[in-house]
Design a protein with these regions (language model features):
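Bacterial N-terminal signal peptides that target proteins for export
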Residues: 1-8
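Aromatic/hydrophobic beta-strand junction motif of beta-rich domains
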Residues: 52-61
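Sec/Tat signal peptide C-region and signal peptidase I cleavage site
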Residues: 16-22
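Short, compositionally biased P/S/T/A/G/V-rich stretches that sit at domain boundaries
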Residues: 22-50
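Aromatic sugar-binding surface patches on proteins
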Residues: 87-96
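Short, exposed beta-strand-loop hairpins at the edges of beta-sheets
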Residues: 99-100, 108-126
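Extracellular Ig-like/FN3 beta-sandwich strand-entry sites
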Residues: 65, 104-106
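Conserved aromatic beta-strand anchor motif in extracellular beta-sandwich/beta-rich domains
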Residues: 70-74, 111
């Protein structure tokens, strides 16, 4: 019986310690810019002849006290990362990337939590 109680307490402790973050990414999108903390002109593809930079915007809910990272990927390679400290129940952050004309193809931005687990992932085409 004593071993069963120890096992139960250990299981509860492990579950509490490894619980997933309760917050979420309520919006995640690509845009050509951000004004007044809001995205303008959402896009899922851009042409190298029209724009050479793009922004990734996220609105985070109930993640105060945590960090999130925008991880920009191209051809399975990390091209840029930016980590943010979340300081409110509703928090909006964005990153921007200048793209070279030779970097055409699929780009992905992963939103990572404190443990670098993927909270959200979005892709766009650069043509």
């Amino acid at each position: 019986m004593r071993h069963l109680i120890k096992f139960a307490l250990l299981t509860i402790t492990f579950c509490i310690g490894s619980s997933a973050i309760a917050g979420s990414v309520s919006r995640a999108l690509f845009t050509i810019g951000v004004e007044n903390r809001e995205p303008v002109i959402m896009v899922d593809s851009i042409g190298s002849d029209s724009y050479n930079s793009i922004s990734f915007f996220t609105e985070l809910t109930d993640l105060s006290g945590h960090t999130v990272t925008h991880q920009w990927m191209y051809n399975d390679k990390v091209m840029f990362e930016k980590t943010f400290d979340v300081a409110g129940a509703r928090w909006r952050v964005w990153t921007s990337k200048t793209l070279l004309p030779s970097w055409t193809g699929t780009w992905t931005v992963n939103v990572l939590d404190d443990d670098r687990s993927v909270l959200e992932s979005k892709s766009f085409e650069y043509q």
